[in-house]
């Protein structure tokens, strides 16, 4: 699949990003999606690391009971699993709830599309850099300082929405093909 190039590019100032379209901005994550620290007052829609599928951010139901305080999140927030960040557990919240355990919860500003930001954070380069900054050997964790300092490419909001919608559509098509292949494999057994 080939896509047309943008007419003009500029250096992003970030080695792993390379060039970006001329009209895009590059800003640190902490300025486009600040950290949420609001503690949950009641247990409502708890989400733990085990509820997030690696590399997709899909919410997985479990019967687990969760203890301890959580961070309140809203629809549109992003939950970044800070424990073992190489697992890429990054969830875009489609409803409000409580992040239980090792999460950095960030809230995109008004000029940032949360789905676009989630896709951007799920880039292999992004995850590898964050993973290289972890502390702790048995249970490596990503700090907010490292995550918040990450450069984030930002096209204008309408373009962010179009890119996120395109990626969501294409990912859904791939999911259908994978499910069909799994069904065919089961038939062959």
Where are the regions a protein language model picked out?
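Sequence-specific dsDNA recognition surfaces
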Residues: 9-13, 30-75
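A structural connector/turn signal
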Residues: 67-68, 137, 149
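Positions in alpha-helical segments
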Residues: 12-15, 101-104, 115, 145-149, ...
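Alpha-helical coiled-coil heptad-repeat register
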Residues: 168-171, 175-178, 182, 189
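Non-catalytic DNA-recognition/assembly elements of restriction-modification systems
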Residues: 8-40, 149, 153, 157, ...
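A short beta-sheet element
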Residues: 69-71, 78-131, 135, 143-144
């Amino acid at each position: 699949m080939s896509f047309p190039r943008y007419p003009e590019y500029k250096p992003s100032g970030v080695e792993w990003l390379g060039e970006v379209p001329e009209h895009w901005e590059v800003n640190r994550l902490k300025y486009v999606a600040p950290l949420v620290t609001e503690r949950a007052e009641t247990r409502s829609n708890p989400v733990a690391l085990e509820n997030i599928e690696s590399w997709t951010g899909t919410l997985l139901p479990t019967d687990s009971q969760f203890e301890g305080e959580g961070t309140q999140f809203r629809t549109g927030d992003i939950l970044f699993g800070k424990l073992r960040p190489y697992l890429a557990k990054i969830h875009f919240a489609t409803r409000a709830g409580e992040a239980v355990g090792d999460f950095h919860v960030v809230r995109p500003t008004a000029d940032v599309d949360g789905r676009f930001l989630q896709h951007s954070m799920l880039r292999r380069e992004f995850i590898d850099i964050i993973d290289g900054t972890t502390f702790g050997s048995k249970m490596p964790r990503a700090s907010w300082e490292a995550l918040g300092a990450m450069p984030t490419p930002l096209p204008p909001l309408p373009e962010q929405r179009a890119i996120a919608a395109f990626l969501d559509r294409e990912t859904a098509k791939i999911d259908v093909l994978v499910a069909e292949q799994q069904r065919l494999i089961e038939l062959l057994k």
